[in-house]
């Protein structure tokens, strides 16, 4: 009822066919995306101020007032019901899966077919993907980093160029997982990890 309070939005898509052209600010991917699934947990302020935490949709509602959280499934109201249960925790920002064909620049700024630039790592070509972004606390040797951004990527690759700056450039076919942790302090170190499975 407070017109100045934050408001909360959620989107859930399952088994959809959606195409869009992405820039580097769209899920950190550059190129043409074909989306199969998409979940988003949003919070915004009507006053333009910095919003607070996102909603934990898995515990937010008690429709029958019995003291137990109830699930919220807008898809249950469709003429042909679909399971679109919105049960996102407040740590989720978004997650999606599909395929991408890159058209971005490489690490040196040269035009190419890069679909992901993340720190000192880039991927070029086309791939199937699953990615997500979360707000989490991360523990490292010096303590706990609070409210970091965790970006998670998984790719199914076919002859994709993987470049690790100042290390090597690879041509990769197979499965690759990549993660990046970014602290709230823009001057602090960020952390990356790559795992390859069944690659050529």
Please give the residue ranges for each predicted region:
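N-terminal low-complexity, acidic/Ser/Thr/Gly/Pro-rich segments
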Residues: 1-200
């Amino acid at each position: 009822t407070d017109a100045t309070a934050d408001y909360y939005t959620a989107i859930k898509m399952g088994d959809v066919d959606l195409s869009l052209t992405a820039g580097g600010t769209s899920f950190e991917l550059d190129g043409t995306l074909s989306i199969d699934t998409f979940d988003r947990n949003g919070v915004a302020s009507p006053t333009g101020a910095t919003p607070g935490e996102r909603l934990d949709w898995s515990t937010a509602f008690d429709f029958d007032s019995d003291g137990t959280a109830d699930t919220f499934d807008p898809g249950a109201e469709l003429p042909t019901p679909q399971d679109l249960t919105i049960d996102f925790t407040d740590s989720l920002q978004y997650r999606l899966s599909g395929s991408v064909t890159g058209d971005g620049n490489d690490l040196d700024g040269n035009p190419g077919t890069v679909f992901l630039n993340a720190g000192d790592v880039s991927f070029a070509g086309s791939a199937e993907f699953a990615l997500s972004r979360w707000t989490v606390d991360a523990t490292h040797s010096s303590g706990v980093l609070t409210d970091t951004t965790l970006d998670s990527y998984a790719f199914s690759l076919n002859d994709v160029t993987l470049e690790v700056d100042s290390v090597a450039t690879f041509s990769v076919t197979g499965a690759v997982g990549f993660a990046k942790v970014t602290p709230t302090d823009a001057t602090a170190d960020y952390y990356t990890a790559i795992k390859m499975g069944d690659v050529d």
